[in-house]
Amino acid sequence: MEELLKKFESKKPEIVFEWKDSETEAEGWIVINSLRGGAAAGGTRMRTGVTKDEVLALAKTMEVKFTVSGPPIGGGKSGINFNPKDPRKKEVLKRWYAAAKPLLKTYYGTGGDMNVDEVNEVIPICYENDILFPLEGVLKGHHKKDEQDTNQIIKQLSEGVPLIVRNKKLTPNPSRDYSVGDLITGYGVSEAILHYYSIYGGEIKGKRVIIQGWGNVAGASAYYLAQAGAIIVGIIDVSGGIVNKDGYTFKEISSLLEQRSSNFLETNNMLSFEQVNERIWGIGAEIFIPAAASRLLSQDQLDQMISNGLEVISAGANVPFGDKEIFFGPISKSADERVSVLPDFIANCGMARAFSYFMQNNCQLNDIAIFTAVSETIKEALLKTFKKNNAKTNISRTSFEIALEQLI
């Protein structure tokens, strides 16, 4: 596996597109690891400090993710180095998508990612640029559909991603307009935990959970885990956090999600980042959900959690461990050898799987069908891994082996 991984990591990407904005200091990259199956896809992220190497690592992660979620295409990623809170953000995105248009019309598909909203930014800005949908390039390059089928699938994608979730079991509030795009990745991260306990043995009820982040993925996964009977004991976010050894009620977690007006935690009894960072890792929890930025978790934080009862990590963030290696650095290995690590390309494949689902001919466009497709895909991937290795350790390594055999 290590040799396969080294080969995959060191292979140069097929296409690197570099952009410098003419009107601001923004710069960006699209990295396409390969045009496997004639196309590649991966979301667009924006933050201060994005680098080409970060985008390359995420493109490779996407390629592995598509072995689970489908379709069988290459991995790509877009990254823009710019402050997402800058009032010029929208104008920067408009110029970015105008520049990226030739790729998006032919063989590259994108979507929302960190600090870039799928429904309110990516879809409408692409449409203004005569890109029928952000995934048009995948339809052209991979699916090779005729005009009639392309239009039908664009319709399914256009209706499916912003579809409002009304089912009472799936939405935190049926009267608020939570879309599939808002909830589906976090749902998948929590379903990965539920399937893990049903496959490997154990019961979700009463398990304590630490959540890192409070954006869409973190918030939704906390909500669904609390709904299933798990107890959230702490949330840490870039701006601070909360901890409670006895845990928060399902009602309290729901209201934290409802109060959120941004991608950050907002509550009256917030601790500072320093205070929460000091206390949260040793509070004691069986489940850890890293769902903030990439490469945040340190060896010391991992050791503290393991010493205090950690059983399983479900990766809401891509590449959550603070290693410099793209895959399987020392912290990642240390986690995988000691606890159950459900890797990013399985746990957070929800949106990728939803896209793949919408690209099928005549798919059912209702919330239950979409969420079921995601849950079943994650279950199937974990069952494949369990079949090859039924131990509760080295789950990530085994899952990588299965994926890399398809790619190399």
What are these regions, as identified by a protein language model?
Residues M1-K20:
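Short, Gly/Pro- and small/polar-rich lid/capping loops
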Residues R45, I306-I408:
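Adenosine-phosphate binding glycine-rich loop
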Residues V68, P72, K77-I204:
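Glycine/serine-rich phosphate-binding loop and adjoining beta1-alpha1 elements at the start
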Residues E23-R36, T67-P72:
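N-terminal glycine-rich anion-binding loops that anchor highly charged ligand groups
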Residues V165-G282:
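Glycine-rich phosphate/diphosphate-binding loop of Rossmann-like nucleotide-binding domains
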Residues V50-E54, P87-E91, R95, D117, ...:
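Conserved active-site and cofactor/substrate-binding residues in soluble primary-metabolism enzymes
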Residues I32-V64:
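N-terminal cap/recognition module
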Residues G240-N244, Y248-V341:
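Rossmann-like adenosine-cofactor binding region
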